[in-house]
Amino acid sequence: MNRDSPKRGARTNMKRGILVLLSLSVLVAVALFTANKWAIRHETIAFHDPDRDNRLVAVQIAVRRDKEMQANAGLIKLPVAVLNHGNTVKNTEYSFLSTVFAWRGYLAVSPQHDLPTDPPMVTKVGEPYVGRLPQIQRGVANIHFAIHEMQKVQPNADYEKVTMVGHSMGGDISMYFAKEYPDEIKKVVTLDNLRVPFLTDGKFKILSFRSKDTHFKPDPGVVPDDEQCEQAGITVVNTGFQHNDMRDTGPDAAKSSIESMLDKFLQESDKSGALKPVPTNVPDILTASPGPVPLSVPLASNPTPNKSVPN
């Protein structure tokens, strides 16, 4: 009798188990890619504003195909989320955010705010928002124009009250828009906005992700204290990530943490139970909503920083 047979058999079973796990991982990755590619439609539409010298406003949209078909048939109205990019960053660099909204049944609209022909943004101490007001107001004009044009493209969407989202400068645009046009806002999500103070009147819920970045600090008075946040329905998530980790080029740990908390926020704040992840022929684990992330607790630490982007 060969005494090594049981050991050899155990090693063989172990190798077989590892191969099965590797194969399953590949299958899961392929299924996720296939499901996302099929279920969510992405498109870039170019609009030109005749009231501003025919200015180009490119809009990236993301929408669930099944929800879009229902909207086209007049069965539902799509909730709308407007995603605003950071300074010098493209509107296409936040697909990890637009995908969360699309899975939840939103029409995600991402306008391109700055163009190569625009003058550079200059910091001016002592001026409103350290000289950023012209760029912020330009962003607000872009949003209104994009919404106006999107009503022609997809009339069966709720443009009267939108969810405003933005990173860095885009977060400032979002908060300023909400300040100027509160009746057009459903809720606000910002990722490390630095200049425009949060609204504390409690008219709508606010979720804000804050970085742990010594190079990007909010101006005094931008982020309310804990007591004000509690009274106004503001949720502040203090992360361990860098300012520029909060976009597609950031580490997976940062994006997955933000996705999870954002999905939980949308689940709790959206009253309609119909906005659920689309059924597919892939395992439930691939389409289930991410689990919750504790509030006010660092989500990760020591990520690899991206190249700094001026704000």
Regions found by a protein language model. Give the residues of each.
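An N-terminal hydrophobic leader/cap segment in hydrolases
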Residues: 17-18, 24-70, 276
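Serine-hydrolase catalytic machinery in alpha/beta-hydrolase-like enzymes
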Residues: 48-157
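Primarily recognizes the serine-hydrolase "nucleophile elbow" in alpha/beta-hydrolase
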Residues: 148-202
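Short beta-strand/loop motif that positions the catalytic acidic residue
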Residues: 207-210
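Conserved alpha/beta-hydrolase "acid-adjacent" motif
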Residues: 215-221
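Catalytic histidine neighborhood in serine/cysteine hydrolases
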Residues: 228-245
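Catalytic active-site module of serine/aspartate enzymes centered on a nucleophile-bearing elbow/loop
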Residues: 250-286
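Long, low-complexity, intrinsically disordered segments
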Residues: 286-311
